[in-house]
UniProtKB/Swiss-Prot annotation:
Catalytic reaction(s) noted: 6 Fe(III)-[cytochrome c] + NH4(+) + 2 H2O = 6 Fe(II)-[cytochrome c] + nitrite + 8 H(+)
UniProt name for this protein: Cytochrome c-552
Residues reported to bind substrate: Y216, H264
Sites where the protein binds heme c 2: C160, C163, H164, H301
Keywords for the protein's UniProt record, in alphabetical order: Calcium, Electron transport, Heme, Iron, Metal-binding, Oxidoreductase, Periplasm, Signal, Transport
Listed pathway(s): Nitrogen metabolism; nitrate reduction (assimilation)
Binding residues for Ca(2+): E215, Y216, K261, Q263
Species whose genome carries this gene: Salmonella typhimurium (strain LT2 / SGSC1412 / ATCC 700720)
EC number, UniProt record: 1.7.2.2
Cofactors (names): Ca(2+); heme c
Length: 478
């Protein structure tokens, strides 16, 4: 009997770890990980939050497209070799988030889920379907593959579940239930000492916007979104971070400079400005409390210009009248614009002069310090101008960054002049005609007729298939 008991103990001592291991892995199987609580269809919340929903829908009224390349063809040269040289429009209403990322020439004209120039990460700020997919597939699963893979999945415009925990009891009771629906944004806030779950409501209001209105890059083989805040949020901090990891978004096709492309760093620039330092949040200015027809207060989700709701926004703090404040803002905007153009002129020359140096036989060693100056100059310029509201958020910081960019561009051109002289080139390097977007695109070798034709074919053939598939899968309302 004792011998049988001993054998039984040995048996269970051997087999128990197996059952334990099996049970642990069973908890991590894909099937059990697919519990999804994110509802991406925004209209599902209309009955519960009618005022917020209708004001959110009104972002479709912000429909005008402004072609930034047509307005300023210099940009084509600065972004030569990068998709932004093909197409870059100024931002418009959130209701167009999915439409615009489909229609921009930057995303190409993929024919299959494995085709195209850009990664899945390019959907990350466009839709609550992103939060749903991350919950369903995990971050690694979501980021895996090309942008086109997400076409049939990411179909609802930026909305409720991007900013609110719509599955929570608080949300059901009419409370904001703010959340960071992107795990990478939560990690970034922790990196700067602002864990979301420990932040006050005012901080959370801006952190929610800071999930998308930030500088970011695509990290590693999987091209996962990461914010470059490990060293801090100032332009020099992020520059140091990128330099340390030897990161570049692309290589300028004229100067061969390893470049950085700033995105939309509103959170960083707001934080550096007087509003951010005084805890005036994004919501205070862009989503004020307004009254509905019955006199009930609600948060206006038609995100827009604070001057459109002056009494509910600016007038809460400022004693000046609307016209006076508009004049101040216009002057700051003009000052930033004027310096922006001066920096761009220097950078355009620097890119063509660098090309001339390469053509004249310059070596990598000779060009390295020059390209580093060009890289830093354009990065500082870009971080200033990519934040479209910097004249309001942090005008002093905008001018400081542009002034620094001007200095770096001047350093690059001085070094180029000396290097070109050693190659026997002492005359000014001529520029091609870049007076229009079309001429600038031709100067960098873009075949825009072909690019546009391919895009139109994609929009007519592939996108309808995406939407049909999304409806069949219940991701879009019929």
């Amino acid at each position: 009997m004792a011998r049988k008991t001993l054998r039984a103990r040995r048996f269970f001592s051997l087999i128990f770890p197996f059952f334990f291991i099996t049970s642990v892995y069973a908890e991590q199987t894909p099937e059990s990980a697919k519990t999804v609580t994110v509802e991406a269809k925004n209209e599902m919340f209309a009955p519960q939050h009618p005022d917020q929903y209708q004001s959110w829908k009104a972002t479709s009224e912000q429909s005008a497209r402004e072609d930034a390349l047509a307005e300023d063809p210099r940009l084509v040269i600065l972004w030569a070799g990068y998709p932004f040289s093909r197409d870059y429009n100024k931002p418009r209403g959130h209701a167009y988030a999915v439409t615009d990322v489909r229609e921009t020439l930057r995303t190409g004209a993929p024919k299959t889920a494995e085709d195209g120039p850009l990664p899945m990460a390019c959907w990350s700020c466009k839709s609550p379907d992103v939060a749903r997919l991350i919950q369903q597939e995990g971050e690694d699963g979501y980021f895996h593959g090309k942008w086109a893979r997400g076409g049939p999945e990411i179909v609802n415009d930026l909305g409720c579940a991007d900013c609110h925990n719509t599955a929570s009891d608080d949300f059901a009771q009419g409370k904001p239930a703010l959340t960071l629906s992107r795990p990478y944004a939560e990690r970034a806030m922790e990196a700067i000492g602002k864990p979301f779950d420990k932040a006050g409501r005012f901080d959370q209001q801006s952190m929610v916007c800071g999930q998308c209105h930030v500088e970011y890059y695509f990290d590693g083989k999987n091209k996962a979104v990461k914010f470059p805040w490990d060293e801090g949020m100032k332009v020099e901090n992020m520059e140091q971070y990128y330099d340390t990891i030897a990161f570049s978004d692309w290589t300028n096709s004229l100067s061969k400079t390893p470049m950085l492309k700033a995105q939309h760093p509103e959170y960083e620039t707001w934080s550096a400005g007087i509003h951010g330092k005084n805890n005036v949040t994004c919501i205070d200015c862009h989503m004020p409390k307004v009254q509905n027809a019955e006199g009930k207060l609600y948060t206006d989700h038609k995100i827009g210009n604070p001057f459109d709701n002056f009494a509910q926004t600016c007038a809460n703090c400022h004693t000046q009248d609307k016209a006076s404040l508009q004049k101040v803002v216009a002057e700051r905007k003009q000052a930033i614009h004027d310096l922006k153009i001066k920096v761009e002129d220097q950078l355009v020359h620097a890119h063509f002069e660098a090309k001339a140096a390469w053509d004249a036989g310059a070596t990598d060693a000779e060009m390295k310090p020059i390209l580093n100056d060009i890289r830093h100059a354009q990065w500082r310029w870009d971080l200033a101008i990519a934040s479209h509201g910097i004249h309001m958020h942090a005008p002093e910081e905008g001018l400081r960054m542009l002034g620094s960019a001007m200095d770096k561009a001047a350093d690059a051109r001085t070094k180029l002049a000396r290097l070109l002289a050693t190659k026997g080139i002492t005359h000014e390097i001529p520029l091609p005609d870049i007076s229009t977007k079309e001429k600038a695109q031709k100067a960098i070798g873009l075949n825009m007729q072909q690019i546009n034709a391919e895009k139109q074919d994609f929009l007519k053939t592939v996108v309808p298939q995406w939407e049909d598939q999304a409806r069949k899968n219940g991701l879009l309302s019929q």
